[in-house]
Amino acid sequence: MCQKGFEATSMNDIADAVGLTKAGIYHYIRGKEDLLFEIMSYGMDMVDEDVIAPAQKISDPEERLRTIVERHAKRILEVGGAVTILLEEMSALTPAHRRTIRGRKRAYYELIRRTLEQLAAEGKLRSVDLTVATFSLLGMINWMSRWYRGDGRLSPPQIVKDFREVALNAVLKSPGIVA
């Protein structure tokens, strides 16, 4: 699904990729849409565990934002193109599954927005609209799945460091530098 997209990927493609027959794959899933939902749910589980849960434990909003940006960027570099499924295949889900995934994405959006609201209240946020800033940060991070190549000249830690600086400087008046 990562390479071809949902519509162009057949159940035979999926069965071949996991070393099963087409009939055998139905022992594990009811259909392609159920598999898509499971993939998206797994992606959101990773965000919950690797980004949201650690960030929610941090009371300082600047440190929380830094953690969100770093951890999400690191996760994108680790899973690569698989993120595109979560970003681009929502319309292939049933309405009930779409609501579930949208709700989980919305909770993450709200965490970032609340963090930016706290930074604004402390006078640390640039004079930017919170909705624009929140979607911009999410867009910047998620777009890494499009351009990052593991064989590039920069190491993942260097990319995360540089990305963090770009992202924080985009929204904060004077971000503290953390090596």
Residue positions per predicted region:
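Short beta-to-alpha loop/turn elements within the nucleotide-binding domains of ABC transporters
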Residues: R30, S59, L154
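Helix-turn-helix
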Residues: C2-D34, E38
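Short helix-capping/turn signature of helix-turn-helix
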Residues: F6, I29, L87-L93
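Alpha-helical structural segments
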Residues: Q3, A17, D34-K57, E63, ...
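Hydrophobic/aromatic-rich alpha-helical bundle segments in the mid-to-C-terminal region
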Residues: V83-S91, R98, A120-V166, S174-A179
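Short coil/turn segments at alpha/beta junctions that flank glycine-rich nucleotide-binding fingerprints
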Residues: Q3-E7, I58, V79, E122-G123
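Alpha-helical segment immediately C-terminal to the catalytic phospho-histidine in histidine kinases
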Residues: A96-R104
